[in-house]
From Swiss-Prot:
Role description: Probable retinal pigment epithelium (RPE)-specific proton-coupled L-lactate transporter. May facilitate transport of lactate and H(+) out of the retina and could therefore play a role in pH and ion homeostasis of the outer retina.
Domain of life: Eukaryota
The protein's name: Monocarboxylate transporter 3
Domain commentary: The two basolateral sorting signals (BSS) are required to direct SLC16A8 to the basolateral membrane.
Ranges per topology, Cytoplasmic: 1-19, 85-93, 141-152, 203-265, 323-330, 379-392, 445-542
Family, per entry: Belongs to the major facilitator superfamily. Monocarboxylate porter (TC 2.A.1.13) family.
Keywords annotated in UniProt: Cell membrane, Membrane, Symport, Transmembrane, Transmembrane helix, Transport
Species name: Gallus gallus (Chicken)
Tissue expr: Retinal pigment epithelium.
Lineage: Eukaryota, Metazoa, Chordata, Craniata, Vertebrata
Catalytic activity, as annotated: (S)-lactate(in) + H(+)(in) = (S)-lactate(out) + H(+)(out)
Basolateral sorting signal as annotated region, ranges: 465-510, 511-532
Amino acid sequence: MGRADPEEGQLPAPVKPPDGGWGWIVLFGCFVITGFSYAFPKAVSVYFKELMKDFHVGYSDTAWISSIMLAMLYGTGPVCSIMVNQFGCRPVMLIGGLLASSGMILASFTTNIIELYLTAGVLTGLGMALNFQPSLIMLGTYFDKRRPLANGLAAAGSPVFLSSLSPLGQVLLEKFGWRGGFLIMGGLLLNCCTCGAVMRPLDAGMKRKTEKAQDKYEAKEMLPMGGKSEEGISTTDGTKKTKKAKKKPKKGKKLLDFSIFSNRGFIIYTISKFILVLGLFVPPILLVNYAKDTGVPDTEAAFLLSIIGFIDIFARPACGMVAGLKWVRPHVAYLFSFAMLFNGLTDICSARASNYTGLVIFCVFFGISYGMVGALQFEVLMAIVGSQKFSSAIGLVLLIEAFAVLIGPPSAGRLVDALKNYEVIFYLAGSEVVLSALFLAMATYCCLNRGKKTPPPEKNPSAGGGSDTEEAESDVQEAEEHSSDNHQPAHGTDKATVAANEEANHVEDEQSGEGGRCPEADGEVSSRAGCNADQTVERDSF
């Protein structure tokens, strides 16, 4: 459909996601940000031995640096959502890049472990969090039909950067020491600012016109008749009074939209993701030590993680391509369930691996399933809540995941110390992932069956299926039709005309039954005078 003319007071059509063009630049920026966010906390572990010597602390003390980074990445999700909704993605990412870089640079001058916690842990972790979440939001803004593929390609940044940052950190440590390495790594993090700079708002050129059109549209709704800003009305004493149109006050923008908790699909996803995170990260954390306990040499044991990373690089884009197929995308939640089930069964089957060949086979299948989970997790969330509410949804989901991250891996480590047996831990972690998969699949199936019994309202998107732009265009088109019907030209302001108009309005109010009450149909955009046209269409993908 063509765009409405803002100068005529009509609402302009929404800007369609280009699914390409500048979106590929945004995708590359998201690829880099995802790589830094997930790989950096693991890459700094190459400096731990030197930090232990200089600060005279144990391994568990230095490991808190990575833990604090991850806690900031997950736990500050709602804060990031509020900042994005208030200031936009680009300013937040620029600030985040400066914070991340400053944290590592300041860490190179620290004299004790506590200062490292505050600089490399808190500052750098917060900076990466302020980059990670907005980059995903922008990716969902620029891609709609190709969004599964875009998510898969962006998620591939994690294994690519993990396989490159760790060797780079080792080289920097040998040539410049840990302080010089921290300085250079801080400089690398300034690339986050570059990635933030390319996150151009999709509606930058339309924002001012849209606000102007909205103001005119609301003003015309409030006019008594005819579309004039003032209208003379004759009174009994022969004088004239003017009746001015009053503009409705604008509703404040929600900094954090908690209405997504009314979406049962979001609740199902959140519970499933919490259970998943309890066991998902346990096998790769314990894999090297598990291999060493079975008699595998140190170099070969470390190579197992490289196998997982290499397979992961190709698994994520491939899974994104599969999820984008027309016959797969409406059922992306079931594909996500299959990926989790595949991952959990891999953990369970590998629990009794007793030689290097068995561990290599485990790493191949774990890399495939782990890549599938990484490629689909945010695509499913976008399909559930839509791009408009994704900024709030991802912040709340990451906050809930933070608790699971703090519970799962530490608890597994304590069980290993107590039982001296890795087999039980792999069984437990795999069972948690399988439980998450079964819960998501069964809950989705039950909710879909319930939805089939009750006919859904019109324009309600199917589960994880259609694009966001189609329903947005239909809402704006409906608003334009109401606007063109209601805005009739004036026929005069004499006393007889005004009386006739007032009588017609009175009859119309009586016929409406509720005196101008707004229609309450879900997703319907009302253009009647005095009605709130800011209703939103709830996306209930499940």
